[in-house]
């Protein structure tokens, strides 16, 4: 279960941040006070839920103001009885270029415990974490939370079907890359209504969770908010779907 949730989390938070090839919009398309909630379903059963928040903070890095991004994830229902998860993540990002300065996580999954911190030095192309210093390939490397918000503010108006991009992210004491393909546009029924969406397909590694022929898809709103509303993937046994439950404090009306 832990490997599955990490895989879906990377997809949700990282799939859109295709790289520095695409310019940022003039202003972020999110704002303080935004709260998004999601549920993770295994077949017809809800296995886990997550809440993502943009919070105000007085914390500065290099004397620059930041946004605090906060994520809480936990198992639910029967899954909570057999494999209890209570994870918390924080990321502090620059208010101008939206790259991360600092990331911390508090992982509680059954008997497994992990607390980690990472300081991003973008200009020096390095990340300093609990287990050492890690070199990064570019001056834009993300944790799994900051990638999500950076990506939402990218200008993707010139994307063409079949375009592929890569994201560099720091997770589990290593720097990894994720390749994403733009698939096209589709309408998706969700708790927010029937919404026009952009569809992406990130690369996934077969193994203990995903089949060799598994395809993973993500749908984000084709509007001013760029909110992920659904993700779906087939695993070794069955399929997993991530669906949005609610969205509060959005900067723009859904569909605009």
Question: For each predicted feature, which ranges?
Answer:
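Acidic, serine/threonine-rich low-complexity disordered tracts
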Residues: 20-120, 158-256
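Hydrophobic, well-structured mid-protein blocks that either form specific transmembrane helices
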Residues: 112-155
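Sec/Tat signal peptide C-region and signal peptidase I cleavage site
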Residues: 15-19
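Sec-dependent N-terminal signal peptides
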Residues: 4-13
């Amino acid at each position: 279960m832990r490997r599955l949730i990490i895989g879906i989390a990377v997809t949700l938070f990282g799939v859109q941040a295709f790289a520095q090839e695409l310019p940022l919009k003039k202003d972020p398309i999110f704002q303080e006070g935004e709260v998004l909630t999601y549920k993770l379903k295994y077949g017809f059963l809800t296995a886990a839920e997550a809440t993502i928040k943009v919070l105000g903070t007085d914390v500065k890095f290099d004397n620059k103001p930041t946004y605090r991004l906060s994520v809480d994830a936990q198992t639910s229902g029967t899954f909570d009885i057999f494999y209890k998860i209570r994870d918390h993540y924080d990321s502090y990002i620059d208010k101008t270029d939206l790259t991360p300065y600092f990331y911390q996580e508090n992982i509680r999954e059954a008997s497994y415990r992990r607390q980690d911190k990472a300081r991003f030095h973008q200009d020096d192309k390095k990340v300093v974490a609990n287990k050492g210093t890690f070199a990064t390939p570019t001056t834009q490397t993300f944790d799994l939370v900051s990638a999500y918000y950076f990506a939402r503010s990218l200008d993707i108006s010139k994307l063409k079907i079949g375009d592929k991009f890569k994201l560099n992210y720091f997770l589990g004491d290593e720097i990894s890359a994720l390749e994403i393909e733009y698939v096209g546009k589709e309408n998706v029924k969700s708790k927010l209504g029937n919404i026009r969406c952009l569809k992406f397909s990130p690369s996934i590694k077969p193994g203990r969770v995903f089949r060799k022929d598994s395809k993973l898809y993500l749908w984000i709103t084709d509007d001013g908010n760029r909110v992920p509303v659904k993700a779906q993937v087939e695993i070794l046994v069955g399929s997993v779907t991530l669906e949005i439950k609610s969205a509060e404090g959005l900067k723009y009306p859904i569909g605009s």
